[in-house]
Structure formats: structure tokens, C-alpha cells
């Protein structure tokens, strides 16, 4: 609870004053009154609220009796020498009035509007101070020029916990570089590892720690009471709980598909309009989502920021990295409700579901053949064109599919990533391992039969 804030005015042509700020009172006292006069006038301005022993009593007026423009409670001469502008610089902490979320909730609408008006004028004058510093070449004494000082003030406002107090204040301050980013929703803080962008530096720093595996808030301690899923923050739980409500608040006006979040429906509507506002600077390919464009750019740079700690394999996408980690742990969290088959990634489960439904939405325009996967259709098209864009660097053999090239490269490297857990035999392809594992199942179930497992393809051959 703020018990008082006195903003000193500036007068005279020399020096800039450091505003005097009253100390914060006990936060437990309820705010009852909030008054102000416009700050930075010829008289001292007072922003006060009632507290213990201060009900309805404002601070005493200041007396501008010194030629340097300083104000004093008592009409006595200024005994201090004229201070340099560097010593009397205006500090953001000196003029900022911070309410806790509980205190802010106690204010009525008129008090909040009054507070915003005071802070808006305060910020304008702080920006003016920064401009004056620059005009007087005082920024030579600082590491940053006056322009950056003004931006620093606004940045401090943006990073405040009480966003509800400062958000509207900052957005209405003119001639500030950060103002454009705030009002348009642009995010100036970009992660150099994955390209994800954030509004605040604090969120960016927290995100960078996630790449290193460090958890600044410890383990996930906030649990969803309905499904038992854990989250690292309360907002994460609240956002997740919306999906349990079963009542999506947003609906596509074109197809009627429902969504829980506004940004989701906006992103979905681009599939109808064909809008792709995000373009790759190198090849010009366009995307509907900014994140997809950033991920695509890694195909040009070859960047693979995600590395597996078990085998050292690197990945370009976080989803591919997480799916790969499950090959080491054996985790298959996505289960089919019709046949109980489990998968390590949701995409595989979705494709598997088309087997039961028989749905094949992707059709070749040349021959009419339909596919359940878009990637399968793309691979099929190469059979019509004869194009083989994927070429092996070691033997110059070309392939129509990228996956076929990767399988071929294992011949040169000798890599056999698919290993049988029972006998240790390894294979270059997962399908070969699956065939081999069936031989163990047949041996276990038919040990009394005349069965001879053949090494050819890992399949068993019955002897008549």
C-alpha cells in the first residue's frame, strides 16, 4: 500500500531534480483515498492515500527558495553547492509507485484511472529528462545515451509484475522506440537457439535455461486435479484446465471448428484464406505460422540445436528430439482406443487411426491413388515425375525419398540403430527388427514343433 508519493517539480534552467518519494506503508491497510495534482508543476505534487495516522492529510508544500530549483520544507537557504546533472539524475525507482496485485484489486475504476494519468505524465517527463540529457551531452558520462535511458524506463515498466498497472500507461507514451513493439504486439526478445520470441527479457532468460535442461523452478509441482498432469507454473495449469471444460470459447466462422484459445482459431482460419504472412528470407517459402518459418530456416543453416544425451544424435525440431528420447526409454504414451496399439508420438497414432477408419484424404491428381499421409502422397508423386532430388554424397546414388537416402547412408556408415533386446542383433531398418522379433515369438510359442528360424530376413521357415 502506498502511503505517499511526492513528485518534485523542476524550475530554473540549471540541473534536473531527483524526485522525493515517501516510504511505502504497511500493505495490510485498505486504500481509501487517492488524490493527486498534476505532477512536475511549479509546486510540489502529492499522490497520497490514507494509512495509519495519515487519513486525509497531505504532505506539506515545498518551498522553491533556491536558485538551483531545489525544494525544501522550510524556507531556508540552500546550504549545498549546485549539484551536477549527473548527481541529480532522475531514477526510475524514485517515481515508480508499485502496488501488489492484492492492493491493485482494491482500487476502484476512478482510482485506477487517476493512477494511470499520474504515471503517464510522469513517464512523459522522464522521457523528456532523457532527451534533455542527450541535448546537454551528458550521456557521455553514461554507458547509454539519453534515448536508451528512456527506453530503459519503459522496459522496466514492461517487466513489472503488475502488468495491469503499466500496460496502458506505456502504450500511450509517444516518441518511444519500445512503444511500437508494445502496441503492435511485436516481440523484440528472440532466442538465438530455437528462434522463439518473447515480450520480456525475463521470459527469454527462463526459456534459454530450458535448453540447458536446467529447471529454475524445480520439478513440475502444479498438478491438474482432473488428469494428474503436472506443470511448472500456475498459469500453465489454468490454461490446461480450460481444455477440460469441454466448452471451446472460439469457433471458426467458415467451417465451424471449435477452439479453446483465440490464437488457435486465428491460426486455423489462415488455412481457409490461404494467408501465409511469414516468408523465408533465403528461398521465399511462405508459412502461416511464424514458428514454422523459423524452424524451416534451419534447413538452410543446417542448425540442429537439440542433442540427445544418450547417443549424441542431434535434431532440428524439438518434437523430433522428444520422440527420439522415447526410443531410449521405451515410452509409448499414445495408445489406440480400438486395438490398444501404442506409439511414441501423436502423429503416428493419428496415421494409425486411418487404418481403422479407412480414411485416405490425400489423393494423387494424376492417377487418383489415395493416401492416408501427406508425406506418402509427396513420395508417390515422384513416381510420375521420375525426379530423384536426394543424392548420396559418397556414391552419387539418387533417391526420390529423403528417408530412402537416410537408410542408404547407413550402408556407408555401418550404423544399425535397431537392436533386438533378446539376442542383441542389430538392424539398419525398424521393419527388419520387427520381422526378427517375430521369430523369437514363434520360437517361444512353438518350441516343440519342427521349427527352424532362418536368418534370411529374420523370418521362420517351417520344415515339413
From Swiss-Prot:
> What functional role does this protein have?
May be involved in transcriptional regulation.
Q: Which organism is it from?
A: Homo sapiens
* Pfam family name, one: zf-C2H2
Instruction: Establish whether keyword Metal-binding is in the entry.
Output: yes
Q: What is this protein called?
A: Zinc finger protein 669
State the Gene3D superfamilies in the record. Answer: 6.10.140.140, Classic Zinc Finger
One Gene Ontology term of the molecular function aspect = zinc ion binding
Q: What is its main location?
A: nucleus
Amino acid at each position: 500500500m502506498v502511503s505517499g508519493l511526492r513528485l518534485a517539480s523542476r524550475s530554473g534552467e540549471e540541473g534536473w531534480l531527483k524526485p522525493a518519494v515517501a516510504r511505502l506503508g504497511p500493505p495490510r491497510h485498505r486504500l481509501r483515498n487517492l488524490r493527486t495534482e498534476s505532477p512536475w508543476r511549479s509546486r510540489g505534487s502529492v499522490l497520497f492515500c490514507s494509512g495509519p495516522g495519515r487519513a486525509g492529510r497531505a504532505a506539506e508544500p515545498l518551498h522553491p527558495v533556491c536558485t538551483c530549483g531545489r525544494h525544501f520544507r522550510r524556507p531556508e537557504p540552500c546550504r549545498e553547492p549546485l549539484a551536477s546533472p549527473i548527481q541529480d539524475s532522475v531514477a526510475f525507482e524514485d517515481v515508480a509507485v508499485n502496488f501488489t496485485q492484492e492492493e491493485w484489486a482494491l482500487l476502484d475504476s476512478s482510482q485506477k484511472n487517476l493512477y494511470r494519468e499520474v504515471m503517464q505524465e510522469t513517464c512523459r517527463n522522464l522521457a523528456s529528462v532523457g532527451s534533455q540529457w542527450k541535448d546537454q551531452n551528458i550521456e557521455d558520462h553514461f554507458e547509454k545515451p539519453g534515448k536508451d535511458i528512456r527506453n530503459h524506463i519503459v522496459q522496466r515498466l514492461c517487466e513489472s509484475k503488475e502488468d495491469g498497472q503499466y500496460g496502458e500507461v506505456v502504450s500511450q507514451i509517444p516518441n518511444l522506440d519500445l512503444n511500437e513493439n508494445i502496441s503492435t504486439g511485436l516481440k523484440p526478445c528472440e532466442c538465438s537457439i530455437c528462434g522463439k520470441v518473447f515480450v520480456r527479457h525475463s521470459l527469454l532468460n527462463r526459456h534459454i535455461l530450458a535448453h540447458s535442461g536446467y529447471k529454475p523452478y524445480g520439478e513440475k509441482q502444479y498438478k491438474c486435479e482432473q488428469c494428474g498432469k503436472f506443470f511448472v507454473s500456475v498459469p500453465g495449469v489454468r490454461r490446461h484446465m480450460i481444455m477440460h471444460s469441454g466448452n471451446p470459447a472460439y469457433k471458426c466462422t467458415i467451417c465451424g471448428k471449435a477452439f479453446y484459445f483465440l490464437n488457435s482459431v486465428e491460426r486455423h482460419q489462415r488455412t481457409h484464406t490461404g494467408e501465409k504472412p511469414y516468408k523465408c528470407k533465403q528461398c521465399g517459402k511462405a508459412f502461416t505460422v511464424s514458428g514454422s518459418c523459423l524452424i524451416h530456416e534451419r534447413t538452410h543453416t543446417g542448425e540442429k540445436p537439440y542433442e540427445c544425451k544418450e547417443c549424441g544424435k542431434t535434431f532440428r525440431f524439438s518434437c523430433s528430439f522428444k520422440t527420439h528420447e522415447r526410443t531410449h526409454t521405451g515410452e509409448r504414451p499414445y495408445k489406440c482406443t480400438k486395438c490398444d496399439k501404442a506409439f511414441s508420438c501423436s502423429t503416428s497414432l493419428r496415421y494409425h487411426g486411418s487404418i481403422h477408419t479407412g480414411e485416405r484424404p490425400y489423393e494423387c491428381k494424376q492417377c487418383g491413388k489415395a493416401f492416408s499421409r501427406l508425406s506418402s502422397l509427396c513420395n508417390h508423386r515422384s513416381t510420375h515425375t521420375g525426379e530423384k532430388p536426394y543424392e548420396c554424397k559418397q556414391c552419387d546414388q539418387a533417391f526420390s525419398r529423403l528417408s530412402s537416402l537416410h537408410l542408404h547412408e547407413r550402408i556407408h556408415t555401418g550404423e544399425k540403430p535397431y537392436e533386438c533386446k533378446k539376442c542383441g542383433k542389430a538392424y539398419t531398418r525398424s521393419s527388419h527388427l520387427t520381422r526378427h522379433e517375430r521369430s523369437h515369438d514363434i520360437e517361444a510359442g512353438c518350441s516343440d514343433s519342427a521349427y527352424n528360424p532362418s536368418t534370411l530376413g529374420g523370418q521362420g521357415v517351417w520344415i515339413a
